[in-house]
Regions:
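Short histidine/acidic/glycine/proline-rich micro-motifs that form metal-
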Residues: 28, 60, 159
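Residue-level recognition of transmembrane alpha-helices
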Residues: 24, 40-41, 87, 132
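Residue-level signal for discrete positions within transmembrane alpha-helices
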Residues: 25-28, 32
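Transmembrane alpha-helical core residues of multi-pass small-molecule transporters
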Residues: 27, 43-47, 135
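Alpha-helical transmembrane segments of integral membrane proteins
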Residues: 1-19, 35, 48, 64-169
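Extracellular/periplasmic helix-loop junction at the C-terminal end of a transmembrane helix
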Residues: 36-68
């Protein structure tokens, strides 16, 4: 949601412009590609070609009982590096879906009378967008995000298999 909200607001506020077309077309592509294909592409390009993170496999470092309470101990950075690709590959299709949903709701809300009234009162565009437009538009976004938690767990099963992460599958 951290990436979907700004992208959706910008795309809706700049509707019909080049920015909107770039965001919408990019999101259409990312929402059409399954998460396991994104996982394989990310593992190949970021893991193998660039070598930034380990492409496959999950071997967490050994942790003693004394180290568990510390975020810096027990290889927290190593865990983070190992989880970047699975998290990104699971979140890209959801970001695309949430952004498109928010964009549609914001465009509909921007055409409401109370938004015109807020603009005629002299409120700034930023205040109108965040207080008068985002709040009513975010209801469906957060409802959809809550309902997609089950699909996220189902998608995690495939991603765990691809990256050899011990978990559900």
């Amino acid at each position: 949601l951290a990436f979907a909200i700004p992208l959706g607001l910008v795309s809706a506020y700049k509707v019909g412009t080049r920015v909107d077309r770039v965001i919408s077309n990019g999101l259409f592509i990312f929402s059409s590609v399954p998460s396991f294909v994104i996982a394989l592409l990310l593992a190949f390009y970021i893991g193998v070609q660039l070598g930034w993170v380990p492409p496959l496999g999950y071997a967490p470092p050994f942790c003693s009982a004394e180290d568990i309470d510390s975020a810096t101990a027990c290889g927290f950075g190593e865990h983070f590096k190992l989880m970047v690709l699975p998290v990104v590959s699971l979140s890209i299709p959801l970001i695309a879906s949430y952004t498109r949903l928010l964009r549609t709701d914001v465009i509909a809300t921007l055409r409401e009378d109370f938004v015109t009234m807020a603009a005629s009162k002299g409120l700034s565009n930023r205040r109108i967008l965040w207080t008068h437009v985002f709040r009513p538009s975010s209801i469906t976004l957060f409802t959809s995000a809550a309902l997609n938690m089950g699909a996220l767990v189902g998608g995690a099963l495939v991603i765990e298999t691809i990256f050899s992460i011990p978990g559900i599958g």
